[in-house]
UniProtKB/Swiss-Prot annotation:
Compositionally biased intervals (Acidic residues): 1-19
Topological type in the membrane: Peripheral membrane protein
Name of the protein described by the UniProt record: Calcium-dependent secretion activator 2
InterPro entries tied to this protein: C2_dom (IPR000008), C2_domain_sf (IPR035892), CAPS (IPR033227), MUN_dom (IPR010439), Munc13_1 (IPR014770), PH-like_dom_sf (IPR011993), PH_domain (IPR001849)
Pfam families from the UniProt entry: C2_CAPS, MUN, PH
Tissue expression remark: Widely expressed. Expressed in all adult and fetal tissues examined, with the strongest expression in kidney and pancreas. In brain, it is expressed at high levels in cerebellum, to a lesser degree in cerebral cortex, occipital pole, and frontal and temporal lobes. Only weakly expressed in medulla, spinal cord and putamen.
Domain called C2: residue spans: 350-464
SMART domains from the UniProt entry: DUF1041, PH
Encoding gene, per UniProt annotation: CADPS2
Length: 1296
């Protein structure tokens, strides 16, 4: 029991009592009172907003008009207060004694909702993690995932709106993160020994650590608030407290109503239910008799309606009958009667009603007898042993023994009896000391006749002593406690006189026995009898106070029980006893009339109102109860009130409270709320269709105002109403009223609009796929709403048509909000072309992000409809169609031959080509149509630019190796061609890193050739990176670029070969010849051209392959030609050397002169050896040119070919020269020179990698044999010999 605080009591002292009308009469034509509004204040909840008289709407209301409105406002507030109090009375009765519903235990637990402050705290925690301000260790991949989650999700305005609407929990945030990282982790490469599931678990654990922060989770409040336990099974006290908050009831008001309604008295609550059910049956009979029915959609439903009313009451009666007689009391041991559901209230006056037998009302009592002490014992010596015995119905118990000087025990004896009026005998004995004594001596006795109403405290009783006993004042102190069985509702002595029973006016002991929830009997008992002497069933009787009967002697306060054909008069000795008897019999009879004694009426209600007279209500409580005007709410007949209207208010207030608690409920009631609403509907006959129609209306209103409502909940209620209206009888109700039909059609239309609006705003109603499964459920519900009846399915095309229309709107909504966010309209009107292009590129990125989120978070629609992805693709096309307008505007503003828009194409095309439904769709084709001319123009200009750069470049080419300018080349812009009236196009997105490696792969190419190769490669890579989606045009582009490259390479090769020939022609023919770097550069250009042709010109199949072969052949032939030219140049030098040696041929004039001169001079001076300078010079020429070629020509294969041909050609020339002199003996100087040249040449070319087969050719063998023969001849003929020069052991000869 809650005691009111003094402040509350004082604050309520000033409430004035006012006359009140009946709240809402059932079937009344009067307008229903205004319902409490949602904006009701806590101190004055439920204040009407427009329900009463309208306020003045003048722009400047006067004080007088405000004065007139104030009484109206007070009147509205008072009317709402009365409605809430009346509702609370009905609610607390449902809570106090439920007999239909239970708190469900299988409901899904709702999660705690997040608020704005928590969202801001989360942002700060994740920002701190990204800034490295936490102790959480994470790798780069996890940090990137968190950064994406923070930027895309946590900072989203849609998430902020979802939090503000109260439909978001911590679990939603966690699930979104989990969904994001699953996609990331699946795309990571496999790591040995580390599964992706382990990575996911680790990332989730780190997320939880960031989410929690450093707060101490162990700090919990000692007492959980009511809102925190609302998801649990609540006690009655918690339910009372909850609905006090819901209906705005003060503690004092609750206390007064609690006492007045006797909520802790199960008998009173059961009796109240019986009265209510009786009233509902009488109302049904009255309705059937007067033919006043609600309007139904069919006339034959009127009789069915009456049967439904009776059937529902019978069901409630059966539920009540199934309860134990006294909930929570001792086990009920009376015989369970088998009675029909149409019990007493349905069969009043029925001659065949089941009669109780006397054995049906046998009671069982527990007696506790506690013997304390005996006083006045003088007849026995102090040291004698005394004891007491207790006897009930022949069963005896004995106390412990005590000395006569202190006869005290405190012993309790427990007995069980079926006698309402048992006889208890207590005797005092002393032990006999005589030898022949057979039994102890009795000192005194007392006989008691206890009842359940007897005093239970210890009292002194005078004992009857034997004759001649000295103990004239012997007393015993004992307590007799006789319990009151749960099914014995009242007992006591009454005078009675009846026509069928108790036909003589006399005083009897009566017991009011409850046999079952609907069966009560008034029984009179004699002493030591377990069965009543007479009994009367109270079914059909009406009890009331009466005036005294003059002819009856005995009894002071009269009352009677009247039934058709029978009257029983009762009388008690005092008023209090009469009130208790009448109250107990009033509960038992189930009568609707509330008997009130005339004296008490005048005392407690001098104004003449009907007061609930309750003996348990103290005078102070009664005064307060009367003063606060609670009487009308307690005494109001529930059968005469419009419970449909009241329940609508109750459900509305409950839903408002639920949506404002700490849980993300999405419109679902808590178990305690469901229990109370279920019990209310069952007990007060609220039709299921009405309940769900009101629920739908409330849920839709909240949803329209921004709250997050679970569409599954809407689906349940709508399906129930649809089944009811279409005759499927979900709750056994077959009647359908016109009002229900009309309201259902209105709600159906409203619900359809709401669902279509939600689908049109799916990104904002279901942000990031939250609540989980909501979009799928919304689509399923829309299909259900579009059905004409509950059994006929709607064609899929009709649903598809509606959803398609919604998604068309969604495209406009999403794009409009996106452009507003990007402020694209301002940019398009004022910005420069470059700025417009930059903004449209940013907008394209946002559009792609939106569509990717749609696919990621809203693809669940395919679970409802297989065609959802197709419609989502159509939605995307509409979305892109809107983007097309802004894109075309930005592109049209670009200057002619501007290539800055290509990144836009690449961005959009890369997204579209990877989407199977959007690839080559309407927008994709439009994008291609816009960029085809641009690409063609770009390629044309690049072709012209490259051709001119080749022409100009080779004209001015210095053939300086490119490695000398490689460091500055990446920063040099492409050259401008004066003949073109425009700047040459620059390759988009070309960075140094993408082409610098090619410069260092070939370090000796020319600037023109390297520039050509880079441009061709960059152009082809650029076109390849476009990933043109249309195959035919893509193939055309590739073919054109390959053929262009072939043409350019052909021109390059021809110009290089021509330049090579000219350069070589100008070179020296003597041993002073050293291959210029420019010649090596030209050689390298051809080598590079060979390499580049494979990449730049290769196409598979057909003409292109043949064209590529042609380029390869041209390059190969050119390389062969320049090798031949080089070899010819080298051989010509050797021929010059041999020409000089020819002067020493035998028989020539010069040879004779030279030989004579040398011999003569040799006698006097050291003459240099002729021919050695010439040999050394030639050998140096060979070696240095070999080194130059080896160092500066890149391709080893061509160097080997060159050296092979050079060596073979050299040996051939020497062999021919020697062959021409077969008939001549070589001059000694000729021999020395040739031996040295041949030996050194052989050795040097072997060191350069010329193979043995080439080195030891037949030509070489011929030369070797000839020189060996000549050497032998010379050694014989010449006295001085060859001075160590010999063909033998040439490998061991030192360097000369």
């Amino acid at each position: 029991m809650l005691d009111p605080s003094s402040s509350e009591e004082e604050s309520d002292e000033g409430l004035e009592e006012e006359s009140r009308d009946v709240l809402v009469a059932a079937g009344s034509s009067q307008r229903a009172p205004p319902a409490p509004t949602r904006e009701g204040r806590r101190d004055a909840p439920g204040r009407a907003g427009g329900g009463g008289a309208a306020r003045s709407v003048s722009p400047s209301p006067s004080v007088l008009s405000e004065g007139r409105d104030e009484p109206q406002r007070q009147l509205d507030d008072e009317q709402e207060r009365r409605i809430r109090l009346q509702l609370y009375v009905f609610v607390v009765r449902c809570i106090a004694y439920p007999f239909n519903a239970k708190q469900p235990t299988d409901m899904a637990r709702r999660q705690q909702k997040l608020n704005k402050q928590q969202l801001q705290l989360l942002k700060e925690r994740f920002q701190a993690f990204l800034n490295g301000e936490t102790q959480i260790v994470a790798d780069e991949a996890f940090c990137n995932a968190v950064r994406s989650y923070y930027e895309v999700f946590l900072k989203s305005d849609r998430v902020a709106r979802m939090v503000q609407s109260g439909g978001c929990s911590a679990n939603d945030f966690r699930e979104v993160f989990k969904k994001n990282i699953e996609k990331r982790v699946r795309s990571l490469p496999e790591i040995d020994g580390l599964s992706k599931e382990t990575v996911l678990s680790s990332w989730i654990a780190k997320y939880d650590a960031i989410y929690r922060g450093e707060e101490d989770l162990c700090k919990q409040p000692n007492r959980m608030a009511l809102s925190a336990v609302s998801e649990l099974i609540l006690s009655k006290e918690q339910l009372y407290e909850m609905f006090q908050q819901i209906l705005g009831i003060k503690k004092l008001e609750h206390q007064l109503l609690y006492n007045a309604c006797q909520l802790d008295n199960a008998d009173e609550q059961a009796a109240q239910i019986r009265r209510e059910l009786d009233g509902r049956l009488q109302l049904a009979d009255k309705m059937a008799k007067e033919r006043k029915f609600p309007k139904f959609i069919a006339k034959d439903m009127e009789n069915m309606y009456i049967e439904e009313l009776r059937s529902s009451v019978n069901l409630l009666m059966a539920n009540l009958e199934s309860l134990p007689v006294s909930k929570g009391g001792p086990e009920f041991k009376l015989q369970k009667l088998k009675r029909s559901q149409n019990s007493a209230f349905l069969d009043i006056g029925d001659e065949n009603e089941i009669q109780l037998s006397k054995s049906d009302v046998v009671l069982s009592f527990t007696l506790e007898i506690v013997i304390m002490e005996v006083q006045g014992l003088k007849s026995v010596a102090p040291n004698r042993i005394v004891y007491c015995t207790m006897e009930v119905e022949g069963e005896k118990l004995q106390t412990d023994q005590a000395e006569a000087s202190r006869p005290q025990w405190g012993t309790q004896g427990d007995f069980t009896t079926t006698h309402p009026r048992p006889v208890v005998k207590v005797k005092l004995f002393t032990e006999s000391t005589g030898v022949l004594a057979l039994e102890d001596k009795e000192l005194g006795r007392v006989i008691l006749y206890p009842t359940s109403n007897s005093s239970k405290s210890a009292e002194l009783h005078r004992m009857v002593v034997p004759k001649n006993s000295q103990d004239s004042d012997l007393k015993i102190k004992l307590a007799v406690r006789m319990d009151k069985p749960a099914h014995m509702k009242h007992s006591g002595y009454l005078y009675a006189l009846g026509q069928k029973v108790w036909k003589r006016w006399k005083k009897r002991y009566f017991v009011l026995v409850q046999v079952s929830q609907y069966t009560f009997a008034m029984c009179s008992y004699r002493e030591k009898k377990s069965e009543p002497q007479e009994l009367m069933q109270l079914e059909g009787y009406t009890v009331d106070y009466t005036d005294p009967h003059p002819g009856l002697q005995g009894g002071c306060m009269f009352f009677n029980a009247v039934k058709e054909g029978d009257t029983v008069i009762f009388a008690s000795d005092d008023e209090q006893d009469r009130i208790l008897w009448v109250q107990a019999m009033y509960r038992a009879t189930g009568q609707s009339y509330k008997p009130v004694p005339a004296i008490q009426t005048q005392k407690l209600n001098p104004k003449g109102g009907t007061l609930h007279a309750d003996a348990q209500l103290s005078g102070k409580d009664a005064d307060r109860f009367q003063k606060h005007g609670m009487d009308e709410f307690i005494s109001a007949n529930p059968c005469k009130l419009d419970h449909a209207f009241l329940f609508r208010i109750l459900q509305r207030q409950t839903l408002d409270h639920r949506l404002n608690d700490s849980y993300s409920c999405l419109g679902w009631f808590s178990p305690g709320q469901v229990f109370v609403l279920d019990e209310y509907c069952a007990r007060y006959g609220v039709r299921g269709c009405h309940r769900h129609l009101c629920y739908l209306a409330e849920l839709m209103e909240h949803s329209e105002n921004g709250a997050v409502i679970d569409p599954t909940l809407l689906h349940y209620s709508f399906a129930f109403c649809a089944s009811h209206v279409h005759g499927n009888r979900p709750d056994g109700i077959g009647t359908v009223s016109v009002e229900e039909k009309e309201r259902f059609e209105e709600i159906k239309e409203r619900l359809s609009s709401l669902l279509e609006n939600q689908i049109s705003h799916f990104r904002y109603c279901f942000p990031f796929g939250r609540p989980e499964g909501a979009l799928k459920a919304t689509l399923s519900l829309l299909e259900r709403v579009l059905m004409k009846d509950i059994a006929t399915p709607i064609p899929a095309e009709e649903v598809k048509k509606v959803v398609r229309k919604c998604l068309e709107k969604a495209a406009l909504i999403n794009y409009t909000r996106l452009t507003e966010y990007a402020k694209i309209e301002e940019t398009m009107n004022q910005a420069s072309p470059a700025r417009k292009l930059e903004e449209i590129l940013h907008l394209a990125e946002l559009c792609i992000e939106v569509l990717q989120q749609n696919e990621e978070h809203h693809a669940e629609g395919r679970e409802a409809f297989a065609w959802w992805p197709d419609l989502l693709a159509e939605h995307a096309e509409k979305f892109w169609a809107l983007f097309t307008v802004d894109m075309d505007t930005a592109l049209e503003a670009q200057p002619q031959d501007s290539w800055d828009s290509f990144p836009l194409f690449q961005l959009l095309n890369n997204f579209l080509r990877n989407d199977t439904l959007l690839c080559n769709g309407k927008f994709h084709k439009h994008l291609q149509e816009i960029f085809v001319p641009l690409v063609v123009r770009y390629v044309d200009l690049m072709e012209s630019s490259i051709a001119q750069s080749i022409h100009r470049g080779f004209e001015q080419e210095t053939w300086q190796p490119v490695k000398n300018i490689a460091n500055s080349l990446p920063n040099v812009a492409l050259p401008k061609v004066p003949s073109l009236p425009l700047n040459l196009p620059q390759i988009p997105n070309i960075s140094t890193a993408s082409w610098m490696p090619s410069l260092y792969e070939s370090t000796n190419g020319s600037a023109t050739s390297e520039d050509l190769f880079w441009k061709l490669d960059a152009l082809q890579m650029f076109v390849f990176d476009l990933h043109w989606p249309e195959q035919e045009f893509a193939h055309h582009l590739e073919q054109r670029l390959k053929l262009m490259a072939s043409d350019m390479l052909e021109a390059c090769v021809k110009r290089t070969r021509t330049a090579f020939e000219l350069k070589l022609q100008k070179a020296s023919k003597t041993t002073d010849l050293r291959i210029p770097a420019s010649v090596c550069t030209m050689f390298n250009v051809l080598v590079d051209a060979k390499k580049q042709s494979t990449k730049l010109c290769a196409l598979d199949g057909g003409q292109e392959q043949q064209y590529h072969s042609k380029i390869d052949d041209l390059i190969d032939n050119s390389v062969k030609e320049i090798i031949s030219l080089l070899v010819s140049k080298f051989v010509s030098v050797l021929e010059g050397v041999l020409s000089k040696l020819s002067r020493y041929d035998e028989g020539t004039f010069f040879s004779s002169i030279l030989s004579f001169t040398v011999k003569a001079a040799a006698k006097y001076v050291d003459v240099p050896k002729p021919g050695m300078d010439l040999a050394d010079t030639y050998i140096m020429f060979v070696r240095q040119n070999q080194d130059i070629l080896r160092e500066k020509v890149n391709e080893e294969m061509y160097i080997e070919k060159l050296f092979d041909q050079w060596y073979s050609s050299s040996m051939k020339v020497i062999c021919v020269w020697l062959t021409d002199r077969l008939d001549l003996q070589l001059h000694i100087y000729q021999l020395k020179t040739l031996i040295k040249i041949v030996k050194k040449t052989y050795r040097d070319f072997r060191l350069q990698g010329v193979l043995e087969g080439t080195l030891n050719s037949k030509t070489y063998d011929t030369v070797h044999r000839r020189l060996t023969v000549e050497e032998a001849t010379a050694s014989v003929s010449e006295g001085g010999g060859l001075q160590g020069i010999t063909m033998k052991d040439s490998d061991e000869e030192e360097e000369g």
